Amino acid sequence: MTFAPTTRQKSPLRNIFDHDFLMMHELQKMITAALGEVHGIVLDVGCGHQPYRRWIKSDVTYVGIDIDSTDSTPTIVSNSMRLPFQANTFDSAICFEVLEHVSNPFVVVNEIARVLQPGGILLLSTPQSWRLHEAPYDYFRYTRFGLQHIVQESGLNVEHIIPIGGVWSHVAQTSLNAWPHHQLGRFLNPAIALTNVIFYSLNKLWHDTRDPLGHLLIAHKATEQQLLHNVHYNI
């Protein structure tokens, strides 16, 4: 990454008393399900404290990269805009809640595509709506179409873009983020829990995904056979 954040989350686990439950609970569910597709050698770009490593299968070889080791635990310290690996090195790549913090997301995704082997998988999540965080290294928010454009420009094939939450999650999470958590602390817990339960239920009953909190994208790098087919098709 191109930033040195002051605070990095060590775990995505949340309960209904957490003010960011509506975002993190949905994000965790989607990511843990998608991680079942990760195989071989996996690169975790912007790994932080490796919070998602626990859900990666034990037979997968894990490599975590981050630009800073003062508040993260990377395998390798390096900038994600110039990954220190040869092309076609990794079978899988993951990049969760990182792309909004890099000044040139096209370069980072191009680098991920470069080091993926043909047929390799990328799992990528970004927020669409979230308050300013890890300032001043907070540059972008992504719609599904912006995210799709960046990944397709790298040559990867986008297969799924899954919304995280919906309009009800958005309304509640925006409100909860503004509450005075530091001042009132645990005294807010009952109100936080009630808000989370009500709006989580509303989101399930009336699932409008036009205004989500974020997205999880799944993409693959074309295999050599697919590339040859495309060449013959275009001749």
Q: How would you describe each model-predicted region?
A:
Residues 5-9, 17, 21, 103-111, ...:
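S-adenosyl-L-methionine-dependent methyltransferase catalytic module, highlighting the catalytic core
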Residues 50, 98, 164-166:
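Flexible loop residues that form catalytic
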Residues 96-99, 125:
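Residues lining the SAM
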Residues 37, 100, 142:
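Residue-level signal for short amphipathic helical patches enriched in basic/charged
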